[in-house]
Structure formats: structure tokens, C-alpha cells
Amino acid sequence: MEHVSKRSIGQFFKRKTSTVDGSKSQKCGTTNQLRKLLHKRRVQKQAVPVESQYRIPGDFRDNQSVRVKNSMYNSSPSVTPSTHHINERYVRYDINTRPLVVVLAISIVFFGCLLVLKDIIIQSSENILSVSKWKIIGASFMGTPYTGLLTGLVGPLLSPFSAVSSWLSFIF
């Protein structure tokens, strides 16, 4: 009796896909790996002129001189080096978005706390204003609509400054 190999749960649920040409199965990979497989299996049938193989990068010539040299060696016109296809490299730029998400989450929590603190700041400013009005103007002024008006004017003026200063202290 043959020994059956034990497979872990992770190996059991691994997804298998067929290769690009469908000949055999392979594990799932990134698109870069698939591009590299395509690149390796591609047969290059393009004729590369001998002159273009030894060209120095940055050595620019006009197409007329290239055609004249090619016509001297070959009777038929050939492909100029300017139309010669260079093998591409597939470069994947990975952008690490985790710091951006962390900063965004912290700023959302921070502004949420500011919304909660805004009510506390307004209540404390109302208390401060009412006490100062009672001391300066007198008790007859308390309870009138002017108290709410004054608090409504002073509260929004003070809260943006506190929000900006606390945000700047958080950053620096």
C-alpha cells in the first residue's frame, strides 16, 4: 500500500491555474510573473541589422546615412535601427500605502475628538462669559437672549484657533 502524502489545509485550498500556454498547472502568481513567462516563450523573428547591434547608445545619426550604408552591403532595403524593437523590462512600482492610511485614520480620529471637544469648549466659554457678565454687568443681565448671542459669537471664534493650534502641535 502506498503512503499518501499529508497535505496541510493551506496546501489543500491553494488555487492552481494553468500556465499561459495551458500545458501544465502552476501556482497563482502576479501579473509580472506571467509577463515574464510570456516574454521567455516569445520567439523573436525580427531581423536585427548587424550595425544596430553595435550602436553606441546616444550616438544619433540621420536615417539617410544608415540607409546608404545598408544599401552598400545589401541590395534590398532593410530595417533601420530606429524601428528596431528593444526588449522591454516590466517594472512594477510598489507604493506603500500603509503610512498614508495610518495618517488618514489618525486625522479622522483627531477631528472626531475635536467635534466632541467643541461642545465642551462652548460650554466652558458660556460658563466663563456668564460669570464675567455677572461680575461686570450684574445679575439683572443674566438669562436674557443676549447671553446666547454673545456666546454664539465668541464660541465659533475661539474653536477654530484651538483646533488649528492642537493640530499644529500634533504635527510638530
From Swiss-Prot:
Chain coiled-coil ranges: none
Positions on the Cytoplasmic side per record topology: 123-145
Protein name: Uncharacterized endoplasmic reticulum membrane protein YNL046W
Species for this entry: Saccharomyces cerevisiae (strain ATCC 204508 / S288c)
Additional detail: Present with 704 molecules/cell in log phase SD medium.
Residue ranges of the TM segments: 102-122, 146-164
Location(s), subcellular: Endoplasmic reticulum membrane
Keyword Transmembrane helix found: yes
Lumenal domain ranges by topology: 1-101, 165-172
Lineage: Eukaryota, Fungi, Dikarya, Ascomycota, Saccharomycotina
Keywords carried by this UniProt record: Endoplasmic reticulum, Membrane, Transmembrane, Transmembrane helix
A Gene Ontology term for the protein's cellular component: endoplasmic reticulum membrane
Bilayer topology term: Multi-pass membrane protein
Claim: Transcription regulation is one of the keywords in the record: no
